[in-house]
Amino acid sequence: MKILVLGATGSIGKQAIDVICQLKYQLVGFSYYQNHNEANNILKQLNPNYVLCHSDPKYNKNVKSDLIELIDKSKPKVIINAINGYHGIEASLIALSKKKDLLLANKESLVIAGSQLEAIRKDTKTTIYPIDSEHSALYDLLKDKKKNQIKQLMITASGAGYFNKDISELRKLTYNDLLNHPNWKMGAEISINSATFVNKVYEIVEAYHLFKIKDIIPVVERSSTIHAGVIYQDNSIHFHATTNDMRWAIQSALTKFDNRTNVVQSLDLYQKTIQFEKIDFEQYPIFKIAYDILKNPYTTRGAVLTCINEHVVKLFQKQKINFLQITELISNFYWNYQHKKIDNIWQINDLIFKIKAAISSKYAYLDK
């Protein structure tokens, strides 16, 4: 199978390259931003014919300009979008518009433009396969089920080691404290988003757009052994468990969840202690934003959330605010912003620019 990887030098991108090698698929091309050393490693390992460097065209290979040219020339069967941040939205849009099945790791695509991308997906008769432990687990659980059998979806959160800790302790957390997630190997930003539960807010919104079910509950399962669950109308519950290895999600998306291919170790249940803990939305009010976004599709709400989160996480990294202020500032800006309707997906970049400008203006005093 011919595969194009967008964002190939990031954490998910590198794991995708590893899975492609193990499955003996063909990497026809990739894009990246500025990690030239990692890009050279991929070129030496798999020698794809087409490379697009977003930061400097002199590193391109057989491509002059943009993603459209990269897709047209490389002619992939599927596209993996592992681009980080809202820049990945355009990549998802182009992939679906080109009638390519999309293997999606970019969260912002669905959080900001889920309704719009779903419309394009239907029009082009393509499929979006998630690359994420929770959504991949749900996809696997739901693939042979009918919607009228489903009562509720459950996604789990680890709590990143800080769930229900004393406020005094949370206030003292530093950027370096949060970099080492207890269960997963992740980048810096997603490690922080895991600790604040913002990542779980994103995942609730993503789950709705992927499965068209609004009744979604988050629960804490500290070991990250159980990734998701489905509660059926007969009140039975099916849980999904795998090792804490994102390559399972990548392998599953590439094989369309056939459950026959194996590139990760089996789960040793005897070494795990599994316990579910309820999340109090009054103690963690950030979750209320997720359900507000679900009630108001085709609006700027998802964009506002991702933009303000990106901004305050950077403030935290620069030690301008403490850990607890991250979600305080997010909630304050989100609930006071005059949200707008998104009529056209091509408006999104302009709307994001305006949102980011409003955020920078409001919180400039914190960045001095």
Swiss-Prot record:
<feature type="binding site">
    <location>
        <position position="12"/>
    </location>
    <ligand>
        <name>NADPH</name>
    </ligand>
</feature>
<feature type="binding site">
    <location>
        <position position="108"/>
    </location>
    <ligand>
        <name>NADPH</name>
    </ligand>
</feature>
<feature type="binding site">
    <location>
        <position position="11"/>
    </location>
    <ligand>
        <name>NADPH</name>
    </ligand>
</feature>
<dbReference type="Pfam" id="PF02670">
    <property type="entry name" value="DXP_reductoisom"/>
</dbReference>
<comment type="function">
    <text>Catalyzes the NADPH-dependent rearrangement and reduction of 1-deoxy-D-xylulose-5-phosphate (DXP) to 2-C-methyl-D-erythritol 4-phosphate (MEP).</text>
</comment>
<feature type="binding site">
    <location>
        <position position="107"/>
    </location>
    <ligand>
        <name>1-deoxy-D-xylulose 5-phosphate</name>
    </ligand>
</feature>
<feature type="binding site">
    <location>
        <position position="158"/>
    </location>
    <ligand>
        <name>1-deoxy-D-xylulose 5-phosphate</name>
    </ligand>
</feature>
<dbReference type="InterPro" id="IPR003821">
    <property type="entry name" value="DXP_reductoisomerase"/>
</dbReference>
<dbReference type="GO" id="GO:0030604">
    <property type="term" value="F:1-deoxy-D-xylulose-5-phosphate reductoisomerase activity"/>
</dbReference>
<dbReference type="InterPro" id="IPR036169">
    <property type="entry name" value="DXPR_C_sf"/>
</dbReference>
<feature type="binding site">
    <location>
        <position position="199"/>
    </location>
    <ligand>
        <name>1-deoxy-D-xylulose 5-phosphate</name>
    </ligand>
</feature>
<feature type="binding site">
    <location>
        <position position="134"/>
    </location>
    <ligand>
        <name>Mn(2+)</name>
    </ligand>
</feature>
<dbReference type="Pfam" id="PF13288">
    <property type="entry name" value="DXPR_C"/>
</dbReference>
<dbReference type="InterPro" id="IPR036291">
    <property type="entry name" value="NAD(P)-bd_dom_sf"/>
</dbReference>
<feature type="binding site">
    <location>
        <position position="132"/>
    </location>
    <ligand>
        <name>Mn(2+)</name>
    </ligand>
</feature>
<dbReference type="GO" id="GO:0030145">
    <property type="term" value="F:manganese ion binding"/>
</dbReference>
<feature type="binding site">
    <location>
        <position position="10"/>
    </location>
    <ligand>
        <name>NADPH</name>
    </ligand>
</feature>
<comment type="similarity">
    <text>Belongs to the DXR family.</text>
</comment>
<dbReference type="InterPro" id="IPR013512">
    <property type="entry name" value="DXP_reductoisomerase_N"/>
</dbReference>
<keyword id="KW-0560">Oxidoreductase</keyword>
<comment type="pathway">
    <text>Isoprenoid biosynthesis; isopentenyl diphosphate biosynthesis via DXP pathway; isopentenyl diphosphate from 1-deoxy-D-xylulose 5-phosphate: step 1/6.</text>
</comment>
<keyword id="KW-0464">Manganese</keyword>
<feature type="binding site">
    <location>
        <position position="106"/>
    </location>
    <ligand>
        <name>NADPH</name>
    </ligand>
</feature>
<keyword id="KW-0414">Isoprene biosynthesis</keyword>
<keyword id="KW-0479">Metal-binding</keyword>
<feature type="binding site">
    <location>
        <position position="200"/>
    </location>
    <ligand>
        <name>1-deoxy-D-xylulose 5-phosphate</name>
    </ligand>
</feature>
<feature type="binding site">
    <location>
        <position position="133"/>
    </location>
    <ligand>
        <name>1-deoxy-D-xylulose 5-phosphate</name>
    </ligand>
</feature>
<feature type="binding site">
    <location>
        <position position="194"/>
    </location>
    <ligand>
        <name>1-deoxy-D-xylulose 5-phosphate</name>
    </ligand>
</feature>
<feature type="binding site">
    <location>
        <position position="9"/>
    </location>
    <ligand>
        <name>NADPH</name>
    </ligand>
</feature>
<keyword id="KW-0521">NADP</keyword>
<feature type="binding site">
    <location>
        <position position="181"/>
    </location>
    <ligand>
        <name>1-deoxy-D-xylulose 5-phosphate</name>
    </ligand>
</feature>
<protein>
    <recommendedName>
        <fullName>1-deoxy-D-xylulose 5-phosphate reductoisomerase</fullName>
        <ecNumber>1.1.1.267</ecNumber>
    </recommendedName>
</protein>
<dbReference type="GO" id="GO:0070402">
    <property type="term" value="F:NADPH binding"/>
</dbReference>
<dbReference type="InterPro" id="IPR026877">
    <property type="entry name" value="DXPR_C"/>
</dbReference>
<feature type="binding site">
    <location>
        <position position="187"/>
    </location>
    <ligand>
        <name>NADPH</name>
    </ligand>
</feature>
<dbReference type="InterPro" id="IPR013644">
    <property type="entry name" value="DXP_reductoisomerase_C"/>
</dbReference>
<feature type="binding site">
    <location>
        <position position="35"/>
    </location>
    <ligand>
        <name>NADPH</name>
    </ligand>
</feature>
<feature type="binding site">
    <location>
        <position position="203"/>
    </location>
    <ligand>
        <name>Mn(2+)</name>
    </ligand>
</feature>
<feature type="binding site">
    <location>
        <position position="134"/>
    </location>
    <ligand>
        <name>1-deoxy-D-xylulose 5-phosphate</name>
    </ligand>
</feature>
<dbReference type="Pfam" id="PF08436">
    <property type="entry name" value="DXP_redisom_C"/>
</dbReference>
<dbReference type="GO" id="GO:0051484">
    <property type="term" value="P:isopentenyl diphosphate biosynthetic process, methylerythritol 4-phosphate pathway involved in terpenoid biosynthetic process"/>
</dbReference>
<feature type="binding site">
    <location>
        <position position="203"/>
    </location>
    <ligand>
        <name>1-deoxy-D-xylulose 5-phosphate</name>
    </ligand>
</feature>
